[in-house]
């Protein structure tokens, strides 16, 4: 990897062509799934899935099977299992996630130990990413899986959004909440496996969460937040791979650091912008109906809180009263307090 190489010269390398394609598909899929994980406050589920996938990789190595396939099977089974446990209500989501997290680590360690010192593959490439070792077959598999994730997530986004905001309300309207939660968990598992050779199993959560955190700072609606998160994810993935080529740094860490740097810049700008322009609110008058998760009114994500749709307008709880928001405006439109 010569530092003097120009962009056209980079593209003449077959492994770089494959690396950039893999980065593009991962940057496309990860933020689309991550936006619903952020809404459901499951930002760390990608880490749990990653450790289960590591156990799958170890089993694949031990049995001389394709590690990507065994990792996919393990991650999907874990995703279905955690949602079924959570749906039964006997164990909270965070406890089930912790069990999955530590169980994946333990199984991976045991299987790796059984493989002996002469492990026939470098597990570091799955832990931290090794995009330059991606084969043409890997790219085809990643592309197919990523496109399935993107298509399903986009098609189900209204239902996934409703469940993420108010699960009980979605269930009351007749939505199959458990099936939707399992679908989201499976999509997360597939995304983890797709991304493990690009950013690594230990860093995949960052690519699912950080672009969405950045997009939500500036987006005016949920749909625009998804689009911006995908753009940021693709830009950071492709830009990180390109930067790692020139700087001779690990691709996974470079991608994540680039995403975090963009988040910090955006957060700083947003804080300064809000302080200069001010956020004004209009207090709702004669509002006697209490809003909350079980009030029966649709909940809409709005900046860092939730508005409740009521009588053609939106209300948000604020310090003992309700602010009123124009549903035709974004959260950047000033309204008076």
What are these regions (language model features)?
Residues 4-9, 13-14, 18, 97-156, ...:
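Transmembrane helix-bundle core of multi-pass membrane transporters
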Residues 19-22, 67-73, 94-98, 143, ...:
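Loop-to-transmembrane alpha-helix initiation sites
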Residues 26, 135-211:
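Helix-loop-helix "hairpin" substructures at the membrane interface of multi-pass membrane proteins
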Residues 35-118, 216-227, 244-247, 271:
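Short loop segments and helix-boundary regions at transmembrane helix junctions
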Residues 52-62, 100-111, 133, 177-187, ...:
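Small-residue-rich segments of transmembrane alpha-helices in multi-pass membrane proteins
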Residues 198, 202-249, 253:
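Transmembrane alpha-helical segments in multi-pass inner-membrane proteins
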Residues 260-293:
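Membrane-interfacial segments at transmembrane helix termini in multi-pass membrane proteins
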Residues 281-337:
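Histidine-centered metal-binding segments
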């Amino acid at each position: 990897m010569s530092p003097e190489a120009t962009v056209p010269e980079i593209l003449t390398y077959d492994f770089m062509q494959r690396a950039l394609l893999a980065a593009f598909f991962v940057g496309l899929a990860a933020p689309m799934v991550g936006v619903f994980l952020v809404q459901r406050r499951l930002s760390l589920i990608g880490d749990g899935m990653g450790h289960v996938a590591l156990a799958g990789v170890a089993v694949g190595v031990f049995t001389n099977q394709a590690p990507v396939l065994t990792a996919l099977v393990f991650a999907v089974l874990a995703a279905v299992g955690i949602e079924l446990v959570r749906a039964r209500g006997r164990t909270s989501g965070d406890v089930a996630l912790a069990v999955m997290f530590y169980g994946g680590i333990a199984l991976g360690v045991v299987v790796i130990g059984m493989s002996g010192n002469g492990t026939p593959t470098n597990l570091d490439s799955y832990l931290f990413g090794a995009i330059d070792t991606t084969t043409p077959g890997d790219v085809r598999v990643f592309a197919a899986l990523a496109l399935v994730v993107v298509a399903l997530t986009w098609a189900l986004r209204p239902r996934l959004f409703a469940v993420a905001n108010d699960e009980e309300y979605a269930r009351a309207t007749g939505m199959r909440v458990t099936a939707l939660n399992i679908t989201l968990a499976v999509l997360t598992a597939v995304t983890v496996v797709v991304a493990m050779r690009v950013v690594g199993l230990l860093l995949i959560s960052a690519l699912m969460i950080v672009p969405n955190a950045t997009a939500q700072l500036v987006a005016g609606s949920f749909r625009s937040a998804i689009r911006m998160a995908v753009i940021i994810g693709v830009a950071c993935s492709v830009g990180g791979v390109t930067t790692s080529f020139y700087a001779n740094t690990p691709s996974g860490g470079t991608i994540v650091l680039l995403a975090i740097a963009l988040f910090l810049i955006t957060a700083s700008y947003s804080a300064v912008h809000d302080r200069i322009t001010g956020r004004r609110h209009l207090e709702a008058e004669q509002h006697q109906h209490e809003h909350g998760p079980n009030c029966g009114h649709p909940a809409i994500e709005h900046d860092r809180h939730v508005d409740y749709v009521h009588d053609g307008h939106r209300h948000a709880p604020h310090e003992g009263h309700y602010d009123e928001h124009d549903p035709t405006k974004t959260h950047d439109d000033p309204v008076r307090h």
